[in-house]
Regions:
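Extracellular TM2-ECL1-early TM3 structural module of rhodopsin-like
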Residues: 29-38, 62-124, 131-141
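Loop architecture of class A 7-transmembrane GPCRs
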Residues: 14-26, 90-113, 134, 139-151, ...
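Class A GPCR helix-loop hinge within the 7TM core
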Residues: 114-152, 214-216, 220, 297-305
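Residue-level signal for the membrane-embedded core of alpha-helical transmembrane segments
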Residues: 43-46, 78, 113-120, 206-210, ...
């Protein structure tokens, strides 16, 4: 569901055929996207699997947060598993060699994973807010059974609508070789994309930023939590906001520029060519979350400081210097 009416597939060597009437040079992203997706796949797959294994052991009846993070990582894994075929597609100049049905499935899985990840990040922020700001009012909702139902509901909410409209969104056309793309985009699809960009970024970002502010404010007033626990909670919420702004932000911003431009620009093809490279770059970095999301596991560990030090050596060195400074200060005070 991209810059494109999902009526996907055109013959690569004839740029004026259906799907690429603009004659866009698809070699422009033929190195960048395959290399980037290859890096994400090689590093992200084992990283997410290891984090999933660790999170599974953290699930307790009174701690449901790992359930939502596990589902976030499952969404990342689904996305990562589509990369080998996308690597082949982009390396061959947007030429899909695996048939229209596999394109339909890969496109569906890819975007379901993106939007499921966004929804689960919102749920993680909400769960932390309820646990900190309203622990008694919503205690009955913070149990494993309820968390599993919430997770299942999110997957259904994300997957069922496109599945129902499967043939309409991803029509099966045997003679085309573009996948999930058409240039220029059509009016109805442009409107659809602008709506999805609003629902999948502007609203969730406002929701997460608002919860971050309120949760941190409530956290400062709580004396029963240790400084390390507070640091862990703040770190998790800050990571959520950072992922939204730095990873999802460029793609959604350039997407808005692209589709608004298509509505007002006199020549759709000239505009499609102008924004093609920036949009594809942002689309590639959209999957950076597959490397960042496993970091949530660190913030859920009770030995957060030690684990963070092992994963992030710079933090370990800073902690060592801090301890040395503290010991020196205490020693000098003792001599006085």
């Amino acid at each position: 569901m991209e810059s494109h009416n999902v009526s996907a597939f055109t013959t690569l060597n004839v740029p004026s055929t259906v799907g690429n009437a603009c004659g866009i040079d698809f070699s422009q992203d033929g190195i960048f996207l395959p290399v980037l997706y290859g890096i994400f796949f090689i590093i992200g797959t084992p990283l997410n699997l290891l984090a999933l294994f660790g999170l599974y052991k953290l699930i307790q009846s009174e701690n449901v947060l790992p359930v939502y993070v596990i589902n976030l990582l499952i969404a990342d894994l689904i996305q990562l598993l589509t990369f080998p075929l996308w690597i082949d597609y982009y390396a061959n100049g947007h030429y899909w060699r695996f048939g229209p049905r596999s394109c339909q499935f890969m496109g569906l899985f890819f975007y379901i994973s993106i939007y499921a990840g966004i929804f689960f990040m919102c749920i993680i922020a909400l769960e932390r807010h309820l646990a900190i700001a309203r622990p008694l009012s919503f205690k009955h909702l913070r149990n494993l059974r309820f968390a599993r139902w919430i997770a299942l509901g999110i997957w259904i909410l994300i997957a069922v609508p496109p599945a129902i409209a499967f043939d309409k969104l991803f029509p099966k056309q045997e003679n085309y070789t573009l996948c999930i793309e058409k240039y220029p985009s059509e009016g109805s699809f442009i409107t659809y994309r602008l709506i999805t960009l609003l629902v999948s970024f502007i609203i969730p970002l406002s929701f997460i930023v608002g919860l971050h502010r309120e949760t941190v404010r409530s956290l400062m007033a709580i004396n029963s939590l240790s400084s390390e626990e507070k640091r862990s909670i703040r770190g998790l919420l800050t990571l959520l906001v950072a992922v939204f702004v730095t990873v999802l932000g460029p793609y959604h911003f350039i997407g808005c520029v692209k589709y608004v431009g298509l509505l007002i620009h006199s020549s759709a093809c000239i505009w499609e060519k102008a924004v093609f490279v920036p949009y594809q770059l942002a689309r590639g970095f959209l999957s950076l979350n597959s490397l960042l999301d496993p970091v949530f596991y660190i913030f859920l560990r009770r030995d957060f400081r030690d684990v963070a030090g092992n994963y992030l050596p710079c933090l370990k060195r800073m902690r060592t210097r801090s301890c040395r400074t503290e010991k020196t200060t205490i020693s000098s005070q003792g001599c006085d």
